[in-house]
Amino acid sequence: MIEADQIPTQRLIEPEVQGEDEAVDRAIRPKTLADYTGQKHVVEQMGIFIEAARKRQEALDHLLIFGPPGLGKTTLANIVANELDVSIKTTSGPVLEKAGDLAALLTNLEAHDVLFIDEIHRLSPVVEEILYPAMEDYQLDIMIGEGPAARSIKLDLPPFTLIGATTRAGALTSPLRDRFGIVQRLEFYDVNELTDIVGRSAHFMNVRMLDGGAREIARRSRGTPRIANRLLRRVRDYAEVRGNGDVDEVTANAALTMVDVDQAGFDYMDRKLLLAIMEKFMGGPVGLDNLAAAIGEEKDTIEDVLEPYLIQQGFLQRTPRGRIATPRAYQHFGLKPEK
């Protein structure tokens, strides 16, 4: 196991945005639904909804996109705006601190434009209150003046589409959630879909992929395109320094092993979590508070970042009594259950 003083400040397989991710993602991001790999049910539905809105010359219904980090929520929002042939203005929940911040964005929208709010679950209550009439009636209620002289005025807004993105749909208030006419959940990608994504990204990055190279990267990418693209960049570095720049299965395996991403896509934190359950708590069940204390990690990080992939891949179970390591987890580490 990796000791505490060996732990890097950022995980290579962390699905949240790091360093150069945003610039690279923007450069290789698909622009149309036809180029969007995976999420077939979402692509099919959005294609119909977008075409219908265009035929009626109306604004698309407000859209909520939710799912784990790194699956393409921002990409999908930009594709929707592109397919509608309208402008998109982008912001995030934490940035909109005051009602005036949101009002400034809303009053600068043209008819049918898209306003994209990332991390929409982090909107402050005062900003959220302003959003309700804007979404429902295309009106902006603002207060003019202060104290006894303060008065409310209504401003008409052009019809627009709000796209909200969140990793925590359950954290949205019911009044906000109910105002979205379209709700889409993004799922983890399978290996074949990620292989296609890695191949496409390699083409844009001028990386020559040979047999098995893209698939080896995809297998360790935890079902997440952002992680796949990040691993591809590290494999490219390795191939250029230790080889001739070409990426095959052997090169990809060597590079990813060097950066501590194993065959299952685990890094030190995944192994630490599973081994804590198996070795310290006899396989579970163990409560979230105890598990967080045992591995020195925040509860939200365990629930939102570490656990979804482990559960989806069958290494971990959540039960009413706590977390349990599955037989597959024991098999991965070559261990036998103690009970």
Curated annotation (Swiss-Prot):
Small ATPAse domain (RuvB-S): annotated segments: 190-260
UniProtKB keywords: ATP-binding, Cytoplasm, DNA damage, DNA recombination, DNA repair, DNA-binding, Hydrolase, Nucleotide-binding
Binding positions (DNA): R318, R323
Gene3D superfamilies: 1.10.8.60, P-loop containing nucleotide triphosphate hydrolases, Winged helix-like DNA-binding domain superfamily/Winged helix DNA-binding domain
Location(s) in or outside the cell: Cytoplasm
Any one of the GO BP annotations: DNA repair
Cystine pairs: none
Chain's role: The RuvA-RuvB-RuvC complex processes Holliday junction (HJ) DNA during genetic recombination and DNA repair, while the RuvA-RuvB complex plays an important role in the rescue of blocked DNA replication forks via replication fork reversal (RFR). RuvA specifically binds to HJ cruciform DNA, conferring on it an open structure. The RuvB hexamer acts as an ATP-dependent pump, pulling dsDNA into and through the RuvAB complex. RuvB forms 2 homohexamers on either side of HJ DNA bound by 1 or 2 RuvA tetramers; 4 subunits per hexamer contact DNA at a time.
Short name of any one Pfam family annotated for the protein: RuvB_C
Protein name, per record: Holliday junction branch migration complex subunit RuvB
Alphabetized GO MF terms: ATP binding; ATP hydrolysis activity; four-way junction DNA binding; four-way junction helicase activity
Stretch list, region Large ATPase domain (RuvB-L): 4-189
Region (Head domain (RuvB-H)): 263-339
Top EC class, one word: hydrolase
Chief place where the protein resides: cytoplasm
Assembly and binders: Homohexamer. Forms an RuvA(8)-RuvB(12)-Holliday junction (HJ) complex. HJ DNA is sandwiched between 2 RuvA tetramers; dsDNA enters through RuvA and exits via RuvB. An RuvB hexamer assembles on each DNA strand where it exits the tetramer. Each RuvB hexamer is contacted by two RuvA subunits (via domain III) on 2 adjacent RuvB subunits; this complex drives branch migration. In the full resolvosome a probable DNA-RuvA(4)-RuvB(12)-RuvC(2) complex forms which resolves the HJ.
Residues binding Mg(2+): T74
GO CC, alphabetical: cytoplasm; Holliday junction resolvase complex
Domain notes: Has 3 domains, the large (RuvB-L) and small ATPase (RuvB-S) domains and the C-terminal head (RuvB-H) domain. The head domain binds DNA, while the ATPase domains jointly bind ATP, ADP or are empty depending on the state of the subunit in the translocation cycle. During a single DNA translocation step the structure of each domain remains the same, but their relative positions change.
Similarity-based family: Belongs to the RuvB family.
Catalysed transformations (reactions): ATP + H2O = ADP + phosphate + H(+)
InterPro entries xref list: AAA+_ATPase, AAA_lid_4, DNA_helicase_Holl-junc_RuvB, P-loop_NTPase, RuvB-like_N, RuvB_C, WH-like_DNA-bd_sf, WH_DNA-bd_sf
Residue numbers binding ATP: I28, R29, G70, K73, T74, T75, E136, D137, Y138, R179, Y189, R226
EC number: 3.6.4.-
Gene that produces this protein: ruvB
